[in-house]
């Protein structure tokens, strides 16, 4: 496929679809042709297509037939169905995070707060099995769109671990901001959970990835998660929460704070915070404590650029950084936010895999380990932090 254009289609027309298309324009070394888009919200998808000069497909089937790669940029509830359809047609599936999950029993009475979390774990593991089985039978592959894996700071830490033979003893990290873009995120039946999965999947997957890197470098096999404990809270739904108007506070049946503790099979650990209660922009970081070094990966914000603005209106038409809140005073504008968060590098790597069969760092097994850990964490949180074993794939 290296000598010809790789035809690509996007499913979904929201936030994720927007940055996927933007970063596809930055892929080098592979001729990527974005053919078109399909979305359940037809007016939104039509507008998305018109703005980018691409085709608006009337059905998912028509899009899949016209392309080599399908980008799954929908709410998580639709990920499995779309990815499996693409794989069954022999196409590659770029699947946004989280890979899959549990989205309720389909009843009107479903309540994300009260249902047995063991049901979610069993259903999520079954979904993973179906997706990986479809991949095994396909000429295509699942390309898991976990941008943290490809963030420059995480890849530099990968180099340090590989070249120094480091033993990673403890990692701790966070993804947090003032609330998700997506209206559907407020409901478990669409998002598969709240902060633990929606935010926590990023630093968690980066931590799982780096332990895989360490294991391959030191022992020839990845080091996998073994057990997890967690707590979750719905802080903006507390009876006494005072809404000052700065945080999203319309969540229906999901958590807005989580703390997850992972124990790996070698006894080392990782702690992941995730929340919707942090002002001042996105707070994304991962710190690594190893036997021979310490690294802090500052994904967002970072201090590559700092700017002081005395009057808010001066920066009215200037993008500073995602979810900054105010542009007045000292800020840390991201000179290239997509680059620091790994989006273009992710797409570049995926299309090297598609076109030239190069090794894939963020694959379905890493995604499966993340989902297995996350839903085991929900089982733990239901028991107020009891340790739960993790099935590793």
Predicted regions: what they are:
Residues 101-129, 236-247, 306-332:
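Charged, glycine/proline-rich intrinsically disordered loops and linkers
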Residues 136-251, 384:
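Predominantly a Rossmann-like dinucleotide-binding segment in NAD(P)-dependent oxidoreductases
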Residues 202-310, 344-357, 375-377, 389-393:
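Contiguous beta-strand/loop segments that form the cofactor/metal-binding neighborhood of enzyme cores
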Residues 2, 10, 71, 117, ...:
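C-terminal helix-rich "cap/oligomerization" subdomain common to oxidoreductases
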Residues 58, 95-96, 142-144, 272, ...:
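Hydrophobic residues in well-ordered beta-strands that form the structural core
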């Amino acid at each position: 496929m290296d000598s010809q254009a790789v035809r690509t289609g996007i499913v979904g027309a929201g936030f994720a679809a927007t940055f996927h298309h933007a970063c596809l324009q930055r892929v080098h070394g592979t001729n990527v042709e974005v053919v078109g888009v399909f979305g359940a919200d037809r007016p939104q998808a039509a507008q998305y297509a018109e703005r980018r000069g691409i085709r608006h497909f009337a059905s998912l089937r028509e899009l899949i037939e016209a392309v080599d790669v399908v980008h799954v940029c929908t709410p998580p509830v639709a990920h499995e169905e779309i990815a499996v359809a693409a794989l069954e047609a022999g196409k590659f599936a770029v699947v946004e995070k989280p890979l899959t999950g549990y989205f309720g029993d389909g009843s009107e009475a479903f309540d994300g707060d009260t249902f047995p979390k063991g049901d979610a774990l069993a259903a999520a593991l079954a979904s993973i099995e179906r997706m990986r089985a479809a991949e095994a039978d396909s000429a295509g592959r699942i390309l898991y769109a976990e941008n943290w894996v490809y963030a420059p700071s995480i890849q530099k830490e990968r180099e340090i671990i590989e070249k120094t033979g480091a033993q990673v003893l403890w990692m701790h990290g966070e993804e947090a901001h003032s609330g998700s873009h997506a209206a559907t995120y407020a409901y478990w039946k669409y998002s598969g959970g709240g902060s633990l999965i929606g935010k926590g999947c990023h630093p968690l997957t980066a931590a799982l990835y780096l332990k895989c890197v360490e294991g391959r470098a030191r022992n020839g096999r990845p080091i996998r998660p073994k057990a997890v404990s967690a707590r979750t809270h719905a802080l903006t739904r507390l009876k006494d929460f005072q809404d000052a108007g700065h945080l999203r506070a319309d969540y229906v049946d999901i958590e807005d704070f989580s703390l997850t503790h992972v124990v790996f099979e070698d006894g080392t650990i990782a702690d992941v915070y995730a929340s919707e209660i942090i002002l001042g922009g996105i707070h994304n970081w991962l710190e690594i404590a190893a036997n021979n070094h310490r690294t802090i990966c500052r994904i967002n914000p970072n201090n590559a650029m700092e700017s002081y603005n005395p009057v808010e209106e001066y920066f009215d038409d200037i993008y500073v950084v995602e979810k900054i809140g105010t542009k007045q005073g000292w800020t840390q504008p991201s000179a290239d936010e997509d680059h620091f968060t790994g989006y273009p590098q992710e797409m570049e790597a995926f299309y090297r895999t598609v076109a030239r069969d190069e090794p894939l760092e963020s694959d379905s097994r890493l995604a499966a380990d993340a989902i297995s850990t996350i839903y085991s964490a929900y089982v733990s949180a239901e028991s107020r932090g009891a340790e739960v074993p993790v099935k590793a794939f």
